């Protein structure tokens, strides 16, 4: 009997240690740390790690498509998702935990991407809608006022990629006065992805507006404005993508 009790005690000890080891193997890291996994090609993340941050961009107002951008204090990462209404699953500005083990990671210039194993021309495939909440968990909210960084055009850096920034004192360049946020294809009558150019008097900022953006047909104010959005990559260049209609007059 004593032998049986001793055996059971040892077995429970081993199981308990195994659970402790599982907990130890799961650890948090920063978005910046994810760059250490990036190689010349898309690779799988083998380690049981997660990042915590805020949803700084999604498909709300049609500004992005099938994508959610999560940022912490060190940077941002885009997760490609096969869902038509990401906002209903991962609301803008919500606090989330992204479990990275098993996801594939790639570098699109200075832009960090997460998704599933690529099967075609894209760097990563989209995470199926049924699996989204397996990888991205909503967390209790706290003060998210610090997710927006104040910048000028001149102070934008590579490390700001996929983070939320706000830039004051911007004016549409004279050549584009009177324009809508997005151009309209004369053949189809539909809006198209458009690049607009703003200046602060010294430097020029390219702002990209998606064809699907809900305010694509609004006129751009011909006055000094503040724009808030994410730093993104478009046509090989760093640009600003306005998020949540982050347009206000100074």
Regions found by a protein language model. Name each.
Residues 17-95, 99-250:
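OB-fold nucleic-acid-binding modules
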